[in-house]
Amino acid sequence: MKPQFSQLHVLRHDKWLLSCLTWIPILLALLIWGVFSAGIARDLPIGVVDNAHSTLSRKLTHMLDASSTMSVDYQFSDLLQAKNAMIEGKVYAYVIIPEHFDRDIYLQRAPQVSVFYNSQYILIGRLISSAVVQAQGFFNAGLETVKSLSHGNSTVQGALGNAVTISTQISPLFNQNTNYAQFLVSAVVPAIWQIMIVVCSILILAANLRVYARKPEHLDRWLGNQPFKVISKTLAAYLPIFLLHGFAFLFWFYFMLDWPFQGHLLPIMIAQLATTIACMIMGAFFFFMTLDAARAMSFAGAFTAPSFAFMGITFPVSDMGSLAQFWRSLLPISHYIEVQVAQASYGTSALTSLTHLLPMASYVLPAFLAVVLAKRHLKKTEATNVPV
């Protein structure tokens, strides 16, 4: 029975493998989407400790609350209450307005407004820090404008010009709405896709070994004397399924969710083909290291665990350490994501994008090693089965 025609038989005997190839990837992708579906972080709860209780302190509080990023949900009477609220997770930050806030402003003593935020939430901390600076900037500009008008400047435009000497326009490119779903999901889902391919490749080989050889000691019943041919045909039967997964999330991102797409799908699909083959090679390599699915899964988990972190999406590659950059170069998905970003965000030429795939030629080495290991196991099997 030829392996490429017998995989339905394998799937009937391995429901877990069938699940990993069908509904589990879809469920994981939808769960990730559900986590980030809000897209933009809004109305993050903060608190205010207003020690001044004055007109200007209330105006500053209103400025903070007017920000789309923050929402002043709590007014605390003292610092201890605010600190406890942050520890309990009720607020992500609190603002302390000092006593004599109005008086110091009128006397030009520059009162200090203190802001404390929970930096354990890196993304939220950055958002709140930026929003507070922006709100305080508007507040200061308003004060300077009123001051300039009170000194006889006859036009609001002129007073505003004195208050804000340089006007800055900051325009985001490539993710203009700063949509975190677009930013994170488009990288997390491919990372999960890579893990699923490597894991499923191990499960496929383990299932074929179990169904057609029964035991590792009878490996020759499955691989015969042509391990490369049998392994290639076995895994090739599942190649369309993995490619279908890849095309499905592209269709979901750029057609159903209608995220901006500047380039062409063909280079990305070529990158998906190369990535799928590379991941299947790594799965085969891990499996034939031990012929044990559990230990192979451990190797695969250690190998693919930092996929998302090392992609270079949330942390620049240039700032990574040498070890991180080396590990990143070993991950197929890190080369794929370069092509996806180049096409989806930048619209670069197909040839320029596909040059990111050149390092993937090095996966010939683990492919060769997988075959060598398979032959080694076959020799052990032959030695074991030699009649005495």
Residue ranges and their predicted role:
Residues 26, 30, 127, 196-200, ...:
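Transmembrane alpha-helix boundary/anchor motif
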Residues 6, 10-13, 175-184, 222-230, ...:
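Membrane-helix interfacial "entry" motifs
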Residues 157-167, 245, 330-341:
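Peri-membrane helix termini and adjoining interfacial loops of integral membrane proteins
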Residues 20-21, 232-233, 299:
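Hydrophobic core positions of alpha-helical segments in small-molecule transporters
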Residues 1-181, 383-388:
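Extracytoplasmic/periplasmic domains immediately adjacent to an N-terminal transmembrane anchor
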Residues 240, 251-252, 259-388:
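Membrane-spanning alpha-helical segments of multipass transporters and channels
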Residues 28-30, 171-253:
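Hydrophobic alpha-helical transmembrane segments of multi-pass membrane transport proteins
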Residues 56-60, 201, 339:
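Hydrophobic alpha-helical segments typical of transmembrane helices
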